[in-house]
Amino acid sequence: MTSVWLTAAALLFVAGTLAAGSLPRIELRIEERILIGAVVSVLVGSVVTYLIALVAGLNVAVVLGASALSAVAFALPWWRRRAEVLASWQAGWKELASPDRRGHLVGVGMTALAAVVLFSVLLTHALGTDAAGNLNAGFQTVWADWSQHLTTTNSFAVAHNLPPQNPLFAGQDLRYPFIPDFQSATLVTLGAAPAVALELPGVLLSVCIVLLIAALAVRLGAGWGAGVLAAAICLAGGGLGFTGILADACLHHGFSATQCTWSGLVAHPGDTLGIVAGTLHDLPGLVAAQPRAYDGLLTPPALQPLPDQQWYTPLFAWWLPQRSILYGFSGALVVLILVITAARSGRRAYQSFALAGLLLGVMPLIHIHTLIAMAIVCAVLAARWPHRGWWITAVVTAIVAAPRLATLIAGPHGSVAAFNVFPTVEPGWMYGSSVARPALSLGSLAGGVGGLVRAVLTPQYWGFWIANTGVALPLCVVVALAAALMCVRGRVGAASRRVMSLFPRDLVQVALGCLAVFAIANLVVFQSWDWDNTKLFAYWYLGAALLLGALVVRLWRRWWPGLAVAAVASSVLLTGVLVLVRLLPWTPIENSVGGPYTSATASDVRVAAQVAASTPSNAVFLTEGKPNDPVLTLAGRTAVMGYYGWLWSYGTDFGSRPQDVRTMLEGCGIQARADCPVFGLLRKYKVDYVEIDDRTADPGIFDSRVDVRWWATQGFAVVARGDHLTVYDVRAR
């Protein structure tokens, strides 16, 4: 019946897409309505399914029934004017298919086809089962992050974790934005394999993001081509890391390290021609067999091409591994199209503002950084385009988001002992070497503003951002200064107006809102791990990408300006292109980054199936903290303490739990049972089962001194056993 249920779900999704796409009472192109409908159907429909599942449980009837209910709910507001809605769809199709729009239709079709092919190839390679039954990831970042997503997904689908408790930290409610994984759990409930359930929404939303960026560019006056280039930059844009391959090719040809530097070329101009020729000779071979990651991702600092690389290729740092940002970013793009169109429509358009508020209101369950970023961007746009509808967006957002926000605000925000307090103030983000990050307060914020101003005045700050993101920040700053100075008299004002004439005015307003996000993210860190502010910088980068795309399209027909701007755009994309080339088949196996990375062996898969079949769904397990622990990722069970790195980054207040977990895992040696603290701790944490794995050198293991032999001699009943791990029933302790 799996194919039947999945087909029914697909048909209901199409119905929901058409119904949701008919909600906005504003002038939209047909491709915009389809994309808006698809994103609203996924995001809001998933929340509706979750709310119903809280009452009725997660099963096939609930999944399909909630999808049908969502489609009906989307249709109710416009049903009485269905003739008008049908006419708008027909008019939209006629406009798209008209002869004078043929080029636009071809552009939309080619972009959609390219995006579908790209993301289908990448995401179907992200996770899968080989002929031997091993579950493998195709990328290291996917191996790491999707282990968490598998855990959350299967905690819903297999262990029926409703209302949701944190499967990585027993006894704590789930504060991680879980709706993306819950939506995948609904697909597992319908019969999809967990890997497919994670991959399918990823393909859909990734394609939607590419098309929505292009549609937004058209809406802002830049054109489809500018939008496609902006989407490419958002996916693969980076900094100057590509220069590292020039140095490697130079060294590979036999030149000295001194000769293979810019200063060396300047100091020995007579050798320049030979060095350049030798470098170019060896460059193709180095491109085909790259010895390191030139974006610095998962690379020790000593091997990174440039010092302090923190901006990695977005495709592999965010879009593939971090599923929540796909849901959040697609929702944000829909919000931008809705509010920009509604604010400039000359009509009340309150429904569109309300729909935007609904999407923002569910973001605390999906991607909290999107809510933060869009609050900043919308505040800037509201000042530029005054409209009463902004208040509707704000009120709806506040009402829908309030319950979840209250939970998050009241929850733990790390601890001083674990060095994971958040939010904190970090002027200039990660450009400096200082690790001091005071907790957010009025005093620290005031000091942080001063620190940021001082940072901006240093060459080190600009060197950091240019090395990491190339021309993106300088371009944004030039446009911002031009916008501020264009009304000034004299040469300064004239020069500013010439700069502004290169960009559509509406696009500049959106880019300035995105630049405001950059400023805030350069001051306040919103999670324990400061690198996670890249989830905010992604929205600044959208504005920078739109500016660069618009500039290229505007100037590319002019010879010298076109050549210059093409070179600038290429410099932003070169590092990402190198990273993508490294995935191709000709890369030597020792330098390959395309996996496989084993998430679970065939034996682990069997053990997980035994655990799921023979233990209560709400049982608590003592595990060794591996990110890819099969008891968590495949059986969906709850751990006393899962992977420490994730929990730390979420701002978990651990208390004594880490030390207690160590004590339990290491056993009591020859100590008498009456004096052994393990059994008291098992009772304290209400542990039902203990999983002991002899692969104590695996990545992420919390305590490598696990006493495998001690646990084997305690006489506990064995629930499941594999090649390396054993699960003991300790309820009779």
Predicted regions located by residue number:
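Membrane-interface helix-loop-helix junctions at transmembrane boundaries of multi-pass membrane enzymes
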Residues: 88-102, 341-352, 385-391, 478-515, ...
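Alpha-helical transmembrane segments at the extracellular/periplasmic loop-to-helix junctions
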Residues: 2-15, 106-117, 144-147, 307-308, ...
